[in-house]
Amino acid sequence: MDVIQSIDLITKNTAVRGGKPCIAGTGLRVTDLVIAHLFHKRSAEELTADYELSLSQVYAALAYYYQHKDDLDKDIRHQVLNARMIKERTVSIQH
């Protein structure tokens, strides 16, 4: 009989980051790491240094992302749109 093991490195708590999946013990969202990895081309090793995480935490976040890709891609699109709107508002205020 197979026993499925899970690694408890990803948590969701409504009191932390609105219940978005985070690396346990941090406020760092899984999507924050994914954006750095996919869009900014940061390697897993670079992410450990950038965010002071263990390699297992980084790979757990990436594994979680690929397991929940559709939902997290929606979150990422929403974050990108919000960032663009904030940037546009900031630029228009400065001019």
Where are these predicted regions, by residue range?
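Long, charge-rich, low-complexity intrinsically disordered regions
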Residues: D2-I4, L9-I10, V16, L38-F39, ...
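Short, amphipathic alpha-helical "recognition" segments used to contact nucleic acids or chromatin
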Residues: G27-K41
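Short, Lys/Arg-enriched anionic-surface-contact patches
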Residues: D8-L28
